[in-house]
């Protein structure tokens, strides 16, 4: 079951609450409220999404957490993004099916001037019992507080949780922050889980940790060879092939 996470310290979460209207209170657990949106439990806490630490509450309600959040970037533009969180070298559990379904839905509902993207794995929280997926609106206060923008996010969420395409579960190693393999996701060739960006220190241990934290077994890995130098590249390829993973070298 999906679990929605809203953070009162986050402007997009607050706008989402404004767009959706009242949600019935089911119970209070510690300092978080559990409410209901459609058929989905909603956990509401007072802090920022990256500060969330009540994973045990999420685990009691479902398996797949979706965090509604703002997106920020150095050169702001209207953006709808999705990604798995993780503060390297550790990461959250990634849900390739959900990340990819949300990306396809975001690109389907996106209207001018919004663009859509899958981001590399970055920032907390790190989960171990449930998968975590961040669904974001960017990249300035104008978009964060826009009912129209957050309405697009809401529409994508409702589209994605219906299910749909199931493609080859794939992790990506050495890519840019905004992944360059999005077209493969849109075509239904792959479902993307963890994306290890080129700017982190890529080691065999980092790749192993990411590989192990997915909701489904990884069947393919796309590795950008220019961004993963030997001997690490050879170690990573050997490890993945030993797991039965189809390794695709790019770049």
Swiss-Prot record:
Recorded catalytic activity of this chain's protein: a D-aminoacyl-tRNA + H2O = a tRNA + a D-alpha-amino acid + H(+); glycyl-tRNA(Ala) + H2O = tRNA(Ala) + glycine + H(+)
Complex formation: Monomer.
Record's keyword terms, sorted: Hydrolase, Metal-binding, Zinc
EC code: 3.1.1.96
EC supergroup of this enzyme: hydrolase
Keyword Zinc set for record: yes
Highest rank taxon of the organism: Archaea
Lineage: Archaea, Thermoproteota, Thermoprotei, Thermoproteales, Thermoproteaceae
Name recorded for this polypeptide: D-aminoacyl-tRNA deacylase
